[in-house]
């Protein structure tokens, strides 16, 4: 059916046996790694002969376990680029009655991430390297939308996981460009900088062949040949800025927490007394607090947004203390410019 309609057939198959069945049935794309055993040479040959594209999706399975166990790494990419509200829900469990949690979540919270994930990760890495070495078409994909794997922010994390399989940065860039285009049959239009192809281009400040994180250094975007400045694309609302600040606070990430504030930030108490001014004073005020209070968690009990002001009723767990208060955040030009704490 898909072939008759000139469509690619992508199949979810994570076991060697089901992957074999899928390819024999005409699958053009395997959208997950084979993770139950090392792929034998005859199947590697079959994948290459049939021009099957392999998308490893290395991080998605473990991200479920990280979320359910509460062992979130709070990767910088997530704190900076994931949907701020969606990411914030991952820590909602901290404010819940743990006795009411589903049994599966209780198990993860008690036992942590099972060791079998280590074996799965190892098998996936070995298979990925074997296929790349054999010349099988490998493309980047994250399966974003699953629990703990977010659109946009999961991309660099997937590349970092692929890098652990001993792939070169050039391998990773090919997987994200021309290989993906080949896999979906659109390499005549996109995937490489060639005459006659659509001019969809990222211009970077730093060389991604030196580090995949340099893909974050986007200077300009060209879409269909039209230049787009980055700062015209991502203009977060005041509420989004404050939510991203909250996520960094709950992650106890001092750098990304401070990054949501303007350099001349002023923080006042309810009587108008200036408590802190500027990033340096904020860092001095919060760094040790973040480091030492390992159970830190701020729950927003209520929120009101009025133009550029975000008013949060906050409940903070800090060690053995529970602190209640109201914070008024004033946002200008995408940064928190002023904070007033109300008793």
Predicted segments with their positions:
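Short, well-ordered alpha-helical segments enriched in acidic and aromatic residues
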Residues: 251-268
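Divalent metal-coordination and catalytic microenvironments
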Residues: 2, 12, 30, 54, ...
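Acidic, glycine-enriched loop/beta-strand segments at the rims
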Residues: 150, 168-173, 182-218
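A beta-strand edge to alpha-helix "cap/lid" segment located at domain peripheries
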Residues: 247-250, 268, 273-274, 281-343
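Structural recognition of alpha->loop->beta junctions
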Residues: 20-41, 158-171
């Amino acid at each position: 059916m898909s072939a008759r309609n000139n469509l690619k057939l992508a199949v979810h198959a994570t076991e060697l046996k089901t992957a074999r069945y899928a390819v024999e049935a005409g699958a053009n794309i395997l959208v997950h790694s084979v993770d139950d055993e090392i792929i034998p040479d005859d199947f590697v040959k079959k994948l290459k002969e049939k021009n099957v594209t392999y998308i490893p999706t290395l991080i998605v399975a473990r991200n479920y376990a990280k979320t359910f166990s509460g062992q979130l790494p709070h990767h910088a990419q997530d704190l900076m680029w994931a949907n701020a509200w969606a990411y914030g829900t991952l820590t909602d469990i901290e404010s819940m009655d743990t006795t009411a949690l589903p049994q599966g979540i209780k198990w993860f919270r008690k036992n942590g991430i099972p060791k079998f994930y280590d074996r799965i990760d190892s098998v996936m890495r070995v298979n990925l390297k074997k296929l790349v070495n054999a010349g099988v078409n490998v493309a980047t994909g994250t399966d974003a939308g699953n629990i703990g794997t977010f659109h946009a922010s999961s991309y660099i994390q997937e590349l970092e996981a692929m890098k652990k399989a001993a792939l070169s940065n050039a391998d990773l860039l090919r997987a994200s460009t021309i290989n993906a285009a080949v896999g979906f049959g659109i390499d005549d239009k996109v995937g490489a900088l060639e005459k006659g192809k659509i001019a969809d281009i990222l211009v970077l400040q730093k060389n991604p062949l030196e580090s995949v994180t340099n893909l974050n250094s986007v200077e300009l975007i060209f879409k269909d040949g039209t230049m787009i400045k980055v700062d015209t694309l991502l203009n977060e609302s005041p509420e989004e800025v404050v939510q991203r600040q909250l996520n960094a606070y709950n992650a106890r990430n001092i750098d990304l927490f401070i990054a949501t504030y303007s350099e001349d930030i002023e923080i006042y108490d309810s009587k108008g007394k200036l408590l802190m001014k500027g990033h340096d004073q904020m860092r001095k005020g919060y760094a040790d607090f973040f480091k030492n209070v390992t159970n830190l968690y701020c729950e927003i009990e209520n929120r009101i947004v009025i133009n550029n002001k975000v008013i949060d009723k906050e409940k903070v767990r800090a060690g053995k203390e529970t602190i209640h208060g109201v914070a008024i955040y004033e946002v200008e030009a995408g940064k928190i410019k002023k904070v007033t704490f109300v008793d």
